[in-house]
């Protein structure tokens, strides 16, 4: 995902252009390290925004020329509002979510559908060691099933677990003066 020079050769080497392409990238790094080390912060930004957006942009052009296809971008609820505990990762995911929204708008009348997936916490290597609430945490297979259903039903934006829609609506609507006092 970081080797953008390899994107076009990779796509050119495919035996056929797929009907569905899914971008699933998640690299959070350590927020404290991201704050002090520009190289580390750049890695988080490039991994979660620049690389996935670049690949999907190239695929979008090819799907548009063909007149069909579905692009799926797995973003994050962390992009719904910047928080002190993960704002480098969250800002990259916010950018990716906005990119997917704009791409969806651009391709809406071109036969190409774009799906944004907001899974919330997922039991993966990235979240290993974190104390996550079970009701808010999905298994990778659950995310995969949700992606498949979203593609089949032509959804635009999905939260893998519906509770995240409510949680993030509340978090987005907390006034900034109060939000700054919270430790989330």
Give a label for each model feature.
Residues 76:
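Residue(s) in the substrate-gating loop at a strand-loop-helix junction
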Residues 56, 92:
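Active-site helix of classical SDR
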Residues 26-42, 85:
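Conserved mid-core segment of classical short-chain dehydrogenase/reductases
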Residues 81-87:
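Active-site loop immediately N-terminal to the catalytic Tyr-X3-Lys motif
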Residues 116, 132-169:
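C-terminal helical subdomain
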């Amino acid at each position: 995902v970081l080797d953008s020079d390899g994107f076009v050769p990779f796509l050119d080497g495919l035996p056929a252009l797929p009907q569905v392409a899914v971008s699933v990238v998640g690299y959070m790094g350590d927020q404290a390290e991201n704050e002090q080390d520009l190289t580390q912060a750049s890695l988080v930004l490039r991994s979660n925004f620049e690389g996935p957006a670049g690949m999907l942009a190239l695929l979008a052009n090819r799907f548009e020329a063909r007149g069909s296809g579905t692009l799926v971008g797995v973003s994050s609820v962390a992009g719904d509002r910047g928080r002190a505990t993960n704002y480098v990762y969250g800002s990259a995911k916010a950018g990716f979510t906005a990119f997917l929204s704009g791409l969806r708008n651009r391709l809406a009348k071109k036969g190409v559908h774009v799906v944004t997936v907001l899974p919330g916490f997922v039991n993966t290597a990235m979240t290993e060691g974190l104390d996550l609430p079970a009701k808010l945490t999905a298994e990778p297979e659950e995310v995969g099933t949700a992606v498949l259903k979203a593609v089949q039903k032509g959804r635009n934006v999905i939260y893998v677990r519906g509770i995240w829609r409510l949680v993030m609506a509340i978090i987005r609507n907390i006034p900034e003066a109060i939000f700054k006092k919270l430790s989330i």
